[in-house]
Amino acid sequence: SNGSNSSYLKEKFKTKSEMTAKLDLLEAIRKEIDRQLEGLTDYDKIKEVHNWLIDNIEYDVNLEADEPYSISGALTEGKAVCEGYARSFKYIMDELQIPCVLVSGTGTNSNGETESHAWNYVQLDGKWYAIDVTWDDPIILGNGYVTDDTYYKHFLKGQNTFFETHQPDGYLSQNSMEFTFPTISEEDYE
């Protein structure tokens, strides 16, 4: 994320027909994902969406996409920064009727550097857990062979592990309204 906070569904369109075409495409993608995941448990749906986003979005290091912070940049151009990954995850969870929130704050990367960042909390079996699809994407890690430990390093995590590298700030809008995020489980999902 570039440090600026923005509203959940913020897209830029040049014309009404462009907007309609993009929204139709996004809705088609969302409905197709929903159709393919029909009959799966919520855990499996969350895991499949996590994996699908990683497989279909490339981290936009050079901000080449028209909308790297948005759902349309992520899902229609296949390029996004953390905010695009997190917004897309929430967009699909909403379709699947799995409670999910977008979280902004700071992340401490493997070099010990702190940066503005965005991720999600998702509810499963009555408890909230953290998911950072962006940092689970191998392209962020330099592309080499990725083990499950790396691919799911930030998948359904509790406070005890997630807060070592992630600190929510409670702000998620341009007018700096403060939000209280759900309290996530202390332990990782088993």
What annotation goes with each model-predicted range?
Residues 144-190:
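Low-complexity, Gly/Ser/Thr/Pro-rich intrinsically disordered linker/tail segments
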Residues 56, 60-66, 76-78, 112-115, ...:
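Repeated polar recognition positions within modular binding domains
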Residues 4-8:
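Extended, well-ordered protein cores
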Residues 71-85:
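A short, highly charged nucleic-acid-interacting micro-segment common to nuclease
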Residues 17-21, 76-80, 104, 109-111:
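Alpha-helix capping and helix-loop boundary segments enriched in small/acidic/polar residues
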Residues 1-3, 190:
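Intrinsically disordered, low-complexity N-terminal segments that are enriched in acidic
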Residues 84-159:
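Hydrophobic/aromatic-rich core segments of domains that either
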Residues 16-74:
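Secondary-structure boundary elements
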